[in-house]
């Protein structure tokens, strides 16, 4: 693991939900009706995050309406066009739209607040017992020489 990226729970600027707890309360009442989108396939981090969030707040993940998009490039227009109620992805996917005022981040999923979103609470600060980060790393092909392995380890440490 080289780094880890916090996830973010994001709504369009005109969403009625002002904080994560308001969203969760509405989601509990209608998990199928409040669709969540993510920029990865089922089983990927953007899918796992809302499923774990659902479980953490007492929603059966099987009841969640998840819409899979092929990356943030498809997720953002769906969110901005109100095709989904909220999005779940790495916080970096949304920074430009946050700065433009097009979306609001209700919570980040790391243990600590994210410097780029210092006014946004973590899930734990909001009373939700969940921490979720996406690890980033480097892989090498099978059979890499010890010499090449050492070069890469030195480069990243």
Q: Can you name each region flagged by the protein language model?
A:
Residues 27, 52, 73-87, 92-102:
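Short helices/loops that flank or line small-molecule/ion binding pockets
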Residues 5, 30-33, 82-83, 100-102, ...:
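Structured helix-beta-strand junction loops
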Residues 48-49, 76-77, 117-121:
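Short, well-ordered secondary-structure micro-motifs
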Residues 23, 79, 123:
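Residue-level signature of catalytic and energy-coupling elements of molecular machines
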Residues 1-74, 135-157:
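Hinge/capping helix and adjacent helix->loop/strand transition within the periplasmic-binding protein
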Residues 18, 93-157:
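C-terminal lobe and pocket-closing loops
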Residues 69, 88-89, 108:
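Short beta-strand and adjacent tight-turn residues that come in two discontinuous sequence segments
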């Amino acid at each position: 693991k080289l780094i880890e990226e916090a996830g973010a729970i994001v709504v369009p600027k005109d969403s009625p939900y002002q904080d994560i707890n308001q969203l969760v309360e509405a989601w509990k009442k209608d998990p199928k009706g409040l669709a969540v989108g993510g920029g990865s396939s089922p089983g990927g981090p953007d899918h796992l995050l809302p499923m774990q969030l659902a479980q953490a707040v007492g929603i059966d993940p099987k009841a969640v309406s998840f819409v899979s998009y092929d990356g943030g490039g498809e997720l953002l227009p769906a969110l901005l066009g109100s095709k989904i109620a909220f999005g779940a992805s790495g916080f970096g996917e949304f920074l430009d739209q946050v700065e433009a005022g097009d979306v609001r981040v209700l919570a980040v999923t790391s243990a600590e607040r994210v410097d780029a979103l210092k006014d946004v609470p973590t899930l734990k600060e909001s009373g939700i017992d969940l921490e979720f980060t996406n690890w980033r790393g480097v892989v090498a092909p099978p059979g890499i020489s010890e010499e090449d392995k050492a070069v890469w380890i030195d480069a990243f440490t």
